[in-house]
Amino acid sequence: MKSKILSVAISLFFITSCNTVKKENSKIIEGEIVHTVYFWLNSPDNLVEVALFEKEIKKLMNTNNLAVKMHLGKPASTTKRGVVDNSYNYCMIFTFPSLKHQRIYQDHPSHLIFIDKAKHLWKKVQVYDSTTEPI
């Protein structure tokens, strides 16, 4: 009996520790669809407009229950190269579990409200959507 209990305990420990290592070491972005949006603001030096844009985009991100993961950032101070475009002001990334979720997001009230309240603040928006490929 003791050996069966010990065997089960060792098995559970082994299974649990293997799963933990796999999750912690995974480099794969979660989500089937990666929705990347770049924003060029009309007045990136206008602190009032920048604050309003940040307020509205953060509201969108905090009310989006469809995304698996999300990111909001500004251009990094990486080495200037011909292939690097740091001309945008903000980058927002959402990952979605499926194309269906991404399509629902497009018509979701929080997305439409964000566009309505913030569209006057940008001069350009560029969207890149991609699907996950096995690695």
Feature annotation, model-predicted:
Residues M1-I28:
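Bacterial Sec-dependent N-terminal signal peptides
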